[in-house]
Amino acid sequence: MKHKSGKRSWKTLYFEFAFLGLKVIVSVKR
């Protein structure tokens, strides 16, 4: 994974965080 742009860094971080949150929500819902 290469990250040269700083703007893309927070975007990727946010995306990963959102994915993790969704996984947790699904786990709790189940």
From Swiss-Prot:
Up-regulation conditions: Expressed during exponential and stationary growth.
Gene Ontology annotations for the cellular component aspect, listed alphabetically: plasma membrane
UniProt key word Cell membrane: yes
GN (gene name): aapA3
Activity regulation field: Transcription of the aapA3 gene generates a full-length transcript whose folding impedes translation. Processing of the 3' end of the aapA3 message generates a shorter transcript that becomes translatable after a structural rearrangement.
Recorded family membership: Belongs to the AapA toxin family.
Assigned keywords, A-Z: Cell inner membrane, Cell membrane, Membrane, Stress response, Toxin-antitoxin system
Organism annotation: Helicobacter pylori (strain ATCC 700392 / 26695)
Protein name: Toxic protein AapA3
Function, in words: May be involved in response to oxidative stress. Toxic component of a type I toxin-antitoxin (TA) system. Neutralized by cognate antisense RNA antitoxin IsoA3 RNA which forms an extensive duplex with the mRNA. The antitoxin gene cannot be deleted, indicating expression of AapA3 is toxic. Non-cognate antitoxin RNAs IsoA1, IsoA2, IsoA4, IsoA5 or IsoA6 are unable to neutralize aapA3. Oxidative stress may trigger transformation of the bacteria to a coccoid form via the AapA type I TA systems. The peptide may penetrate the membrane leading to lipid reorganization and thinning of the bilayer.
Compartment annotation: Cell inner membrane
